[in-house]
């Protein structure tokens, strides 16, 4: 009942109100020219007016409530990702105190983390990371030797939008008389091998020319990012932690190598010839995958429209794609990244470092101002946990954007097991970038790849850890 829900509601351990004299709390957030009109742009910090759009209006009302309660003004400045790192450096080194909260893009942020530009969020007054409005997976993944320079929070839907998932075309699945895909997920049977089987069954060379073209129906529409997504779907990560809360490069166990080799078979299906009936299974693996990063003039929009126009059974995506796809005609469902094997405990969904940023607080904030910003962030996060996040998941993703109740259940699975791998964030020794090229290059010799990178990766982890420890001491 509603009363029980109210009783169970966790409240922030901060005063319910304060008077900061209409002081401005200014957020600096990365942007990307060309992305301004898409959902990849941050839409969760401020809203100018009530428009009738669910996320916008929830953000507007959230801010109004917190601004009234604490007598502050929440403001936003967007800056292109090509400029924001320099601006943050100048801000901190110049001690100008312009910005109170910063969101550089996650892919570009590690160099800033190592320069002592940001407070350890664990030490900011009034912020309680044990509360559910701070993402515990992000806290665990990003903290190194106790230092947490950035965090994912309920204030934002942007990092949820950056979560990997898979869409499937229901019409193609029905025409190919495939088994019920939702049931596979619910029964824990949605695996790499099952993806391969279904994709092979759905692939059609419509024009009969024997070659893969966008005129045909692919089993899986993807890009180079798929290799990262599939690997992390296995529940494994490149980087884990030791007893001192330090990063350790643990990628390369026998099971992990097997996982990657399977991923390669999937990613590389476009790049091989099919010559003989005796290689039917291999042929199917080779034929049904499209890597849009290796085909000329295929940007993200073109790639998405291929799926919307019925040219693929499966479509690798981030959740931000769902908002764009709802305008199309395709009857699609949403499912998590497949498991490596049925016995795996859960489905895991990677968060893309390329399309999100996480919250940091610059070390230029001190004393009363730091305490004020901590309180406002805690209040915003708590309020968002009960308003913005439910609105995002229940209304925007489930009701507005998904076409059926079953996709709604899948979204809970996707959101509840999100993976932040430190390797994807820090890219130690360029490993993450090189790994993403393995699929394109059809390199299945994973052991040699690891061996060639191990020394440099270990060296860069050590260097990064020392820099983060020094940054924590300074911050």
What do the PLM-derived regions correspond to, one by one?
Residues 21-56, 72-77, 101, 218-220, ...:
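Short, well-ordered beta-strand elements
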């Amino acid at each position: 009942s509603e009363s029980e829900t109210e009783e169970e509601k966790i409240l922030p351990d901060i005063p319910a109100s304060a008077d900061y004299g209409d002081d401005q709390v200014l957020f600096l957030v990365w942007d990307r020219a060309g992305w301004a009109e898409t959902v990849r742009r941050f839409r969760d910090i401020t809203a100018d007016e009530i428009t009738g759009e669910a996320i916008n209006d929830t953000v507007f009302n959230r801010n109004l409530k917190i601004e009234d309660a604490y007598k502050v003004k929440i403001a936003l400045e967007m800056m292109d990702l090509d400029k924001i790192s320099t601006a943050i450096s100048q801000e901190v080194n110049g001690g100008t105190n312009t910005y109170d909260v910063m969101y550089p893009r996650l892919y570009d942020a590690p160099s800033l983390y190592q320069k002592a530009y940001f407070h350890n969020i664990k030490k900011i007054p009034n912020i309680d990371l044990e509360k559910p409005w701070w993402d515990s997976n992000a806290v665990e993944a990003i903290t190194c030797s106790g230092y947490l320079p950035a965090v994912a929070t309920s204030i934002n839907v942007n990092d949820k939008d950056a979560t990997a998932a898979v869409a499937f075309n229901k019409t193609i699945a029905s025409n190919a008389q495939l088994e019920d895909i939702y049931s596979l997920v619910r029964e824990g049977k949605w695996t790499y091998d099952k993806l391969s089987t279904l994709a092979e069954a759905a692939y059609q060379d419509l024009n009969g020319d024997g070659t893969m073209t966008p005129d045909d129906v692919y089993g899986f529409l993807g890009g180079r990012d798929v290799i990262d997504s599939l690997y992390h779907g296995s529940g494994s990560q490149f980087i884990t932690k030791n007893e001192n809360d330090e990063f350790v490069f643990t990628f390369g166990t026998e099971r992990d190598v097997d996982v990657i080799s399977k991923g390669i078979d999937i990613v590389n299906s476009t790049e091989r010839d099919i010559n003989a009936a005796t290689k039917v299974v291999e042929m199917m693996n080779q034929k049904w995958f499209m890597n849009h990063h290796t085909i000329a003039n295929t940007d993200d929009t073109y790639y998405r429209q291929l799926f919307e126009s019925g040219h693929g059974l499966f479509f690798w995506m981030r959740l931000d794609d769902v908002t764009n796809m709802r305008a199309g005609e395709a009857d699609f469902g949403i499912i998590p990244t497949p498991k490596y094997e049925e016995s795996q405990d859960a489905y895991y969904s990677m968060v893309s470092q390329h399309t999100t940023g996480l919250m940091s607080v610059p070390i230029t904030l001190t004393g009363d101002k730091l305490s004020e910003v901590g309180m406002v962030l805690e209040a915003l996060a708590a309020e968002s946990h009960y308003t913005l996040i439910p609105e995002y998941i229940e209304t925007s993703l489930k009701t507005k954007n998904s076409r059926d109740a079953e996709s709604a259940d899948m979204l809970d699975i996707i959101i509840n097991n999100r993976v932040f791998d430190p390797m994807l964030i820090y890219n130690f020794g360029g490993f993450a970038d090189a790994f993403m090229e393995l699929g394109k290059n059809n390199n299945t010799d994973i052991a040699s790849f690891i061996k060639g990178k191990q020394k440099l990766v270990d060296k860069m982890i050590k260097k990064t850890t020392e820099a983060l420890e020094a940054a924590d001491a300074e911050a």
